Amino acid sequence: MSATALGMIIFAYLCGSISSAILVCKAAGLPDPRENGSGNPGATNVLRNGGRLAAAAVLIFDVLKGMIPVWLAYTLEMSPFYLGLTAIAACLGHIYPVFFRFRGGKGVATAFGAIAPIGWDLTGLMVGTWLLTVLLSGYSSLGAIVSALIAPFYVWWFKPQFTFPVAMLSCLILVRHHDNIQRLWRGKEGKIWRKKGAKSAQNSERPASASPPHDDEPQTPR
């Protein structure tokens, strides 16, 4: 491994370790996403707790965390294998951030950003797949899972030389969503949107000492 490749991998991990959800919520005076809602510091949980504007900011920053390192590696003409390692490093930084006690998010938005430098046509297909799945099912996690499963086939069709690194990235996303897959199978996964009345009742009735639910876990009034 060259010094350039090693440096890019380390840089990607450090970029991924910047938790935009925590920083945006702190700057906006919103609750810490690690201690509220699902407990997951990601755009979906920020959407539930803080609204669309804060969630949009988190989403953009998370995408850039994956896009910038991989784009730099791409311009340096690194091999597809090391491009894949750079993308995985960015996602690992998001999932296990060194700056925030290794407690991070799911890595979906960062993975989208890491794939973007391969081609905007591929990125459009990926975003379209996620959006269509969420609109039809209401499950953000299902959108991520379906997108991760189909991503290697999209890449194989457009730029087959990147199939292996994207497949590695997809495996990481699927492993990270193993709890969501189990809840989807049992029919206990929560949807991305909830009625405001149900949310207010759930928040008012939950004991202060109660631990936050898992990401995308159904949150109904007791």
From Swiss-Prot:
Keywords: Cell inner membrane, Cell membrane, Lipid biosynthesis, Lipid metabolism, Membrane, Phospholipid biosynthesis, Phospholipid metabolism, Transferase, Transmembrane, Transmembrane helix
Protein name (Swiss-Prot/TrEMBL): Glycerol-3-phosphate acyltransferase
InterPro entries: G3P_acylTferase_PlsY
Assigned GO CC terms: plasma membrane
Pfam families given in the database record: G3P_acyltransf
Residue spans crossing the bilayer: 5-25, 53-73, 80-100, 112-132, 138-158
Reaction catalysis annotation: an acyl phosphate + sn-glycerol 3-phosphate = a 1-acyl-sn-glycero-3-phosphate + phosphate
Family of this protein: Belongs to the PlsY family.
Organism lineage string: Bacteria, Pseudomonadati, Pseudomonadota, Gammaproteobacteria, Enterobacterales
Enzyme class: transferase
Annotated SMART domains: G3P_acyltransf
Highest taxon above the source species: Bacteria
